[in-house]
């Protein structure tokens, strides 16, 4: 463990403090707060992350003194910190099973809105680092949870991601789950509204998906009204996919002349120019005096902002305000550099982190600091545009508050920042809400500014009608409210701004403006009339556009009715026509002026960009390929500081960068090395590897596509890469830099036949020691989890076929590395855990001795740490590890007679401990027991200890049996000299070096005297009997029956593999689909041992078969075999234990590849075969191992359902019930679907078992209950229910449950 400390407390010590029941909660709260501060402000040691997570999860369980809330905040900061420090994202991927359920369940906490928002932000950070893991967790947890609040918040979170982060968010993946949630909650309007908004935004960005969404919605059994609500947005998108022609037809005069097209285009240009002129009035232009600062890479960007952060902590003082201003100026320089284009997402993350500091700077009383902070916010909005939206929510409150400042410069700067945000961010309902609130402020400045913000929104709507989406009605209602209040405001400046904004409103929403006019008082209407005349076609608020709107006649009538002079004249119709013509001619000069000014301002930008520009989606007219130059010029018109499309900085970037990119693109497209490496032809790939090797030797610049191509080749044709790693050290290191550490180590493990010190030294020069240990553990995890491996199909097949080769190489590499390099406590624990998983995998292989050697090496490095880790290992595996290193178990009541007494022998760690033999000459006081011969293939009903069997069968005179056991047991040179006796604790023991059977003569007399004294010690037998005993010791087992081999699967697998290979060679069987189907038929027609052996050989030989056969088996063969097995079990006699057990072994092998078996038939087979068996029978242990190895989610849920139904029955068989309870104990500790109804159901089942006379029922129920309480994935409501039902039991029962919770 790393020695990194904070406040003189190491992470392990802090974990002990939080886990202790004796330490006061105040002390725990103080320590967790210190941990949160450490994570938030300091760079953490990533090796301590697992311990930090343990501390935080312990803290989440403590509801007192707000410890749970502080712990969750610490988790949020930890996720952010890891995402910043760990660029590979491996840590978050590894810990997703622990973190994501906490975050997702937090979304359903209605009592803590702040916690919900924090969970959303943490999920966002997590998704940016590990998108697949987050999406899978949401699918499995959020939409399967009965808490609808979680579902609603999840949909809202998706909407936020889609709008602000990525338009490529995979919404279709979640659509079936969302529609299913609506099916089961048809009256929940919140889900429907949230879903409608999500679909609307997604379809706006991906219109091609509309038809697919419609079909999916129609395929679900939803109410027609619900479909209409969801499909309303879809249909609107279908109609709105070509919105501009409708507007054009509505506003175009009788003929489609070129003049009318130009006029329509000028309308669009007018909105654009008017918006630019309005923004220039609030100082929107970017300051050109600040120099740009380029950043080398994303790491440098994060490190730079981390340096900025400390000065913004706490209050502003005389000593830190200048530092703050300096950092703000440097941020403005960074914003102008390459980070806004090359590291955009990282820059947004950094700004999000320092947003609080920006707000502090803007609120400063020092004018320069406040002004520079506001300028920074404005420039962030102009340059980053919609990417800034996640940060904007934290900036708006401070800025709007600053708008009310009595200090005019501060108020003006705040208005400038808010206007820039409104001009560049996508529309949300909160925008109009802020405008409404500001219009009600008692100070006149916020009221005036609110009209400017509303004016900006109206112009953006005029430019792009889809800007506000489906918020039309709420926007218009809020705008009417603002106009009704501010058109009659007491301040004349506010009234004038309101009039200008109103005339913009009439051009965008003419019908709504007309309805509003009828509601206004006469004096306000007259004031509007005067402002219309005074505008004179200039300024920012002209009365009309060139093309007349349908609402304008009604507006004229309203004004004419209130104009006495016009009413008294009553001119003839011809004069009326002339007057009407005059009214229409009033606004004509303005568009002409605007267009001419626009032409003059845009002549220079057009010179540098000769290519035809893309036309805005919001244009009023579609571009025509046959349009004249004049129309084309109008489409091209843009201002120099364009708001809606490009950052002004992009225009000033050096053109040399574009040329470089073009050259790079050209070279990559025509590079023969890239073409060869991406080919599917083996010869071309080899040629590409040779080209790459010579390119590396020649120190050429390699294209970026090489990395992904090499990863693909490493999975499909790894041996082709051998020249890269065997030529010389330089090519080795360069090739290593092109691969990820895990892929690099996997390639080395397969390319090199043996690892030596030179190779390991070279590997560690390429990747540091900690990364080497991490990658080695990752590879061992893949081997242990085969075939459930994440990644491509090629990677899965490679690991499955080469798992023993990879394991051997990695174990060799770890052995060499551990002898040369130090290992931290975290790495020590990770290596130990991976080795424990490999015991079952390697038990019956030749590499088991290598695994044992590595265990002993770890024990030599740190015996205390090793002993602590052994205590956490479960039962049988724990005994195996203790046996390997010679630790005497403290949990066993009697010592297994097959194990040696290490108390009598001093073992040197450097000695060869692989071979232990019995003394050939038993002493006179030895006890000797002769054992009967064991039947082949577990044919008899008795099962003996595997090591006893190995010793007995090693001395058997039968050549056939001797040959079989020689293959199963590890190779020993002294096998023919082994004794048939079983020695007790007083046996003579020797450790053989190279096969010798005599005691080591080099031991001195003192050692012999010490051993002799220990033997004759009269109190030694009594001390050996002092053991920790099980609390359910009253469950006596029949001591006459020998113990079952702890690794039945590995032992049975070894026997089958050896025997099957002999038979296969004899019968000349071939791995073909035809032969496989023939054997399946024979298995059904004539059930026998030979048919089982053949089928087992087919499954066992899958890893060495051809690719075609593997594809056949994984797609069709496994289902054919499953069907044949069910028919096999239905025909055989269940009393034939040998046949049943061998059939179960084949079924267990099949379940590794088939994740969708018939669970009902599986459970029926369990009941059929175990109904007459005892708890210590072979079949019981076989079934128990098979059930505990199930690891597919759907399969586990289905079997859990069957087990609960069985336990709810009236009459329960002890053996079957015990198997069901063991399985439930496994799954309940991590169950993500626990709700109150299921808790009461489980309580009914377990409560009934507490009153059973049979002790095994009571013990199993207690263990299940303790695992249920240890589940950390439950909601607070479920947690309270668990505590409530537990409190109803007697105190003795509660203590037993708490006892097992601590194990």
UniProtKB/Swiss-Prot annotation:
Record's compositionally biased regions (Basic and acidic residues): 554-568, 596-609, 634-648
Classification via SMART domains: TOG (SM01349)
Keywords of this entry: Cell cycle, Cell division, Cytoplasm, Cytoskeleton, Microtubule, Mitosis, Nucleus
Superkingdom of the source species: Eukaryota
Subcellular location: Cytoplasm, Cytoskeleton; Nucleus; Cytoplasm, Cytoskeleton, Spindle
InterPro entries: ARM-like, ARM-type_fold, CLASP_N_dom, TOG
UniProt region (Disordered), positions on chain: 239-259, 531-664, 953-977
UniProt-listed SUPFAM superfamilies: ARM repeat
Extent of Polar residues compositional bias: 249-259, 573-583, 618-629, 653-664, 955-972
Gene3D superfamilies: Leucine-rich Repeat Variant (1.25.10.10)
Principal subcellular localization: cytoplasm
Keyword Mitochondrion carried by entry: no
GO terms under cellular component: cytoplasmic microtubule; microtubule organizing center; mitotic spindle; mitotic spindle midzone; nucleus; spindle microtubule
GO MF terms held by the record: microtubule binding
GO biological process, one term: astral microtubule depolymerization
PANTHER family: CLASP, CLIP-ASSOCIATING PROTEIN
Record text on subunit structure and interactions: Interacts with microtubules.
Cited function: Microtubule binding protein that promotes the stabilization of dynamic microtubules. Required for mitotic spindle formation.
Protein family: Belongs to the CLASP family.
Protein name as catalogued: Protein STU1
Naturally occurring in which organism (per UniProt): Candida albicans (strain SC5314 / ATCC MYA-2876)
Gene behind the chain: STU1
């Amino acid at each position: 463990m790393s020695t990194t400390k904070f406040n003189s407390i190491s992470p392990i010590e802090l974990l002990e403090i939080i886990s202790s029941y004796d330490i006061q909660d105040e002390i725990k709260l103080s320590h967790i707060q210190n941990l949160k501060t450490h994570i938030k402000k300091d760079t953490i040691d990533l090796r301590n992350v697992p311990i930090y997570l343990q501390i935080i999860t312990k803290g989440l369980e403590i509801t007192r003194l707000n410890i749970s809330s502080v712990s969750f905040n610490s988790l949020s900061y930890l996720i952010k910190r890891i995402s910043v420090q760990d660029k590979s994202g491996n840590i978050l991927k590894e810990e997703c099973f622990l973190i994501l359920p906490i975050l997702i369940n937090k979304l359903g906490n209605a009592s803590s809105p702040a916690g919900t928002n924090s969970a959303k932000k943490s999920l966002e950070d997590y998704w940016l680092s590990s998108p697949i893991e987050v999406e899978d967790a949401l699918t499995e947890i959020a939409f399967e949870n009965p808490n609808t609040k979680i579902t609603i918040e999840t949909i809202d979170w998706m909407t936020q991601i889609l709008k602000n982060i990525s338009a490529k968010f995979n919404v279709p993946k979640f659509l079936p789950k969302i529609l299913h949630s609506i099916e089961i909650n048809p009256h929940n309007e919140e889900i429907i509204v949230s879903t409608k908004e999500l679909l609307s935004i997604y379809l706006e960005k991906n219109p091609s998906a509309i038809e697919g969404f419609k079909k999916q919605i129609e395929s679900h059994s939803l109410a027609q009204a619900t479909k209409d609500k969801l499909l309303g947005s879809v249909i609107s998108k279908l109609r709105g996919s070509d919105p501009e022609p409708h507007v054009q037809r509505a506003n175009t005069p009788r003929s489609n002349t070129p003049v009318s097209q130009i006029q329509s285009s000028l309308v669009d240009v007018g909105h654009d120019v008017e918006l630019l002129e309005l923004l220039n009035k609030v100082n929107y232009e970017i300051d050109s005096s600040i120099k740009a600062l380029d950043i080398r890479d994303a790491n440098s960007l994060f490190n730079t902002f981390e340096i900025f952060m400390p000065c913004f902590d706490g209050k502003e003082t005389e000593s830190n305000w200048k530092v703050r201003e300096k950092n703000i100026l440097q941020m403005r320089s960074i914003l102008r550099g390459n980070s806004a284009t090359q590291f955009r997402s990282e820059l947004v993350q950094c700004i999000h982190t320092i947003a609080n500091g920006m707000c502090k700077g803007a609120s400063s009383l020092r004018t320069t600091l406040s002004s520079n902070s506001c300028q920074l916010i404005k420039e962030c909005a102009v340059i980053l545009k919609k990417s800034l939206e996640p940060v904007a929510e934290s900036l708006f409150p401070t800025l709007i508050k600053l708008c009310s400042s009595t200090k005019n410069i501060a108020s003006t700067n705040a208005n400038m920042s808010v206007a820039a945000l409104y001009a560049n961010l996508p529309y949300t309902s909160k925008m109009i809400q802020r405008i409404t609130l500001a219009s009600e402020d008692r100070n006149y400045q916020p009221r005036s500014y609110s009209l400017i913000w509303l004016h900006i929104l109206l112009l953006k709507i005029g430019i792009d009608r889809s800007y506000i989406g489906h918020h039309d009605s709420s926007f218009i209602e809020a705008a009417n409210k603002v106009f009704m209040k501010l058109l009659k405001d007491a301040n004349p400046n506010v009234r004038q701004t309101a009039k200008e904004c109103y005339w913009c409103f009439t051009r965008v929403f003419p019908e709504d403006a007309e309805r509003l006019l009828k509601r206004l008082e006469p004096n306000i209407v007259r004031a509007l009339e005067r402002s219309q005349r005074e505008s004179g076609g200039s300024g920012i608020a002209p009365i009309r556009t060139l093309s007349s709107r349908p609402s304008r006649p009604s507006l004229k009538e309203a004004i004419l009715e209130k104009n006495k002079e016009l009413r008294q004249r009553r001119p003839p119709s011809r004069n009326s026509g002339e007057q009407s013509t005059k009214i229409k001619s009033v606004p004509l000069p303005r568009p002409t002026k605007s267009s001419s000014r626009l032409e003059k301002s845009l002549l220079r930008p057009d010179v540098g960009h000769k290519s035809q520009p893309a036309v805005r989606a919001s244009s009023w007219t579609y571009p025509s390929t046959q349009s004249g130059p004049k129309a084309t010029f109008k489409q091209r018109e843009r201002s120099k500081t364009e708001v809606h499309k490009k950052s002004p900085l992009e225009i000033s970037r050096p053109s040399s960068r574009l040329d470089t990119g073009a050259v790079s693109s050209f070279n990559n497209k025509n590079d023969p090395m890239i073409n060869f490496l991406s080919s599917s032809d083996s010869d071309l790939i080899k040629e590409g590897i040779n080209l790459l090797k010579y390119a590396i030797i020649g120190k050429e610049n390699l294209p970026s596509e090489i990395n992904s191509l090499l990863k693909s080749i490493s999975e499909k044709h790894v041996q082709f890469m051998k020249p890269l790693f065997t030529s010389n050290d330089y090519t080795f290191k360069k090739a290593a830099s092109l691969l990820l550490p895990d892929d690099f180590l996997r390639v080395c493990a397969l390319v090199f036949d043996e690892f030596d010190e030179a190779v390991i030294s070279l590997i560690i020069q390429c990747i540091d020691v900690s990364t080497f240990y991490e990658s080695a553990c990752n590879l061992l995890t893949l081997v242990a989890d085969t075939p459930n491996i994440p990644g491509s199909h090629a990677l899965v097949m490679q690991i499955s076929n080469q798992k023993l080769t990879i394991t051997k190489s990695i174990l060799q590499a770890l052995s060499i590395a551990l002898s040369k390099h130090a290992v931290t406590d975290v790495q020590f624990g990770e290596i130990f855990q991976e080795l424990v998983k490999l015991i079952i995998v390697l038990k019956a292989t030749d590499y088991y001795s290598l695994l044992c050697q590595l265990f002993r090496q770890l024990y030599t490095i740190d015996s205390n740490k090793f002993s602590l880790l052994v205590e956490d290992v479960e039962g049988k595996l724990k005994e195996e590890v203790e046996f390997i290193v010679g630790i005497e178990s403290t949990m066993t009541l009697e010592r297994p007679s097959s194990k040696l007494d290490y108390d009598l022998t001093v073992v040197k760690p450097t000695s060869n401990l692989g071979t232990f033999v019995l003394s050939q000459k038993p002493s006179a006081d030895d006890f000797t027991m002769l054992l009967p011969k064991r039947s082949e293939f577990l044919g008899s009903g008795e099962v003996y200890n595997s090591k006893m069997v190995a010793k007995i069968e090693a001395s058997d005179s039968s050549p056939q049996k001797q040959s079989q056991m020689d293959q199963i047991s590890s190779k020993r040179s002294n096998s023919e000299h082994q004794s048939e006796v079983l020695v007790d604790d007083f046996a003579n023991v020797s450790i053989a070096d190279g096969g010798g059977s005599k005691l080591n003569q080099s031991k001195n007399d003192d050692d012999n005297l010490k051993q002799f004294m220990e033997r004759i010690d009269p109190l030694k037998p009594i001390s050996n009997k002092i053991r920790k005993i099980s609390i359910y010791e009253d469950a006596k087992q029949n001591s006459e029956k020998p113990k079952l081999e702890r690794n039945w699967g590995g032992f049975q697998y070894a026997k089958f593999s050896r025997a099957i290979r002999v038979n296969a060679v004899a019968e000349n069987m071939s791995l073909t689909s035809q032969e496989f189907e023939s054997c399946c038929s024979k298995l059904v027609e004539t059930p026998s041992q030979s048919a089982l052996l053949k089928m087992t050989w087919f499954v066992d030989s899958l890893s060495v078969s051809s690719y075609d056969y593997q594809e056949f088996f994984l797609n069709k063969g496994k289902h054919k075999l499953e069907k044949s097995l069910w028919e096999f079990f239905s025909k055989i006699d269940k009393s034939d234990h040998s046949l049943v057990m061998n059939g179960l072994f084949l079924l267990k092998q099949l379940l590794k590849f088939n994740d969708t078996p018939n669970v009902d038939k599986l459970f029926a087979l369990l009941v059929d075969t175990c109904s007459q068996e005892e708890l210590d029978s072979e079949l019981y242990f076989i079934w128990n191992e098979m059930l505990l190895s199930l690891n597919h989610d759907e399969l586990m849920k289905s079997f859990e359902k069957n087990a609960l139904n069985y336990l709810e029955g009236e009459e329960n068989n002890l053996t079957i019930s015990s198997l069901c309870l063991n399985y439930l104990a496994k799954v309940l500790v991590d169950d993500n679907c626990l709700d109150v109804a299921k808790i009461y159901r489980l309580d009914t089942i377990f409560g009934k078992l507490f009153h059973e006379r049979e002790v095994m029922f009571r013990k199993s129920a207690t263990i299940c209950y303790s695992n249920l309480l240890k589940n950390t994935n439950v909601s607070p409501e479920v947690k309270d229910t668990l505590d409530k039902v537990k409190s109803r039991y007697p105190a003795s029962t509660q203590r037993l449950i708490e006892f097992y919770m601590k194990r």
